[in-house]
């Protein structure tokens, strides 16, 4: 979203064209409104996107956590550390099953850094210190391989790569699955850190109960 500089939206009421400016402090950002609407307000016919220099340096890691909420605390620490990872996604135990990267007994953190300017050893080292301090386990050899060359492909393999592939394939599975009697969908939300644990538990319980009541079938709900 941060790379979008301007958009042109065709709506039933007319055309909305935003200005091509690197930034503006004049009220709400209309481009955010257009992007977030996901087609409900109109059809995006044009978009200007800031070109980015492809990263030359990459580092990636996946970590396992026996305690899901310890993993959540780890993600909070990473988010507030100033390290700014390019990818920081936490999969709860159920989500690891859907992604084919776990057996449902542990949570998994997918972590990555990218840069065109500098090697990433110091950033990854500090991130892994945070991971370890929260009880996470990772493959040090795999992390080292991910930083072994400027053209590393290690970040596309292993657990992190398997999750990425599953994430990209999921939209293509959704419609065929309906023909097999399986309905899959996602919804997004946000909550403050201090309320996350009770919120997570409540959503899982309430949504599972609602699906079972409506379909008579046991539902599977996961979080990432």
PLM features: residue spans?
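C-terminal substrate-recognition/cap domain of FAD-linked oxidoreductases
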Residues: 53, 59, 63-64, 72-224
């Amino acid at each position: 979203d941060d790379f979008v500089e301007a958009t042109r939206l065709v709506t039933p009421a007319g055309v909305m064209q935003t200005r091509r400016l690197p930034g503006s402090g004049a009220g709400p950002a209309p481009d955010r409104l257009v992007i977030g609407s996901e087609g409900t307000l109109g059809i995006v016919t044009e978009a200007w996107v800031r070109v980015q220099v492809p990263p030359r340096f990459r580092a990636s890691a996946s970590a396992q956590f026996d305690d899901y909420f310890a993993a959540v605390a780890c993600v909070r620490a990473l988010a507030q550390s100033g390290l700014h990872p390019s990818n920081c996604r936490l999969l709860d135990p159920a989500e690891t099953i859907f992604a084919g990267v776990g057996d449902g007994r542990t949570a998994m953190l997918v972590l990555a850094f990218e840069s065109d300017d500098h090697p990433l050893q110091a950033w990854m080292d500090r991130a892994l210190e945070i991971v370890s301090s929260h009880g996470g386990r990772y493959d040090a050899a795999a992390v080292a391989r991910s930083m072994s060359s400027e053209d590393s492909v290690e970040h596309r393999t292993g657990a992190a790569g398997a999750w990425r592939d599953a994430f990209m394939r999921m939209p293509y599975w959704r419609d065929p699955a309906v023909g097999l009697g399986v309905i899959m969908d996602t919804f997004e939300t946000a909550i403050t850190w201090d309320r996350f644990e009770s919120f997570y538990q409540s959503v899982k319980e309430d949504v599972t109960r609602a699906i079972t009541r409506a379909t008579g079938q046991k539902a599977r709900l996961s979080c990432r």
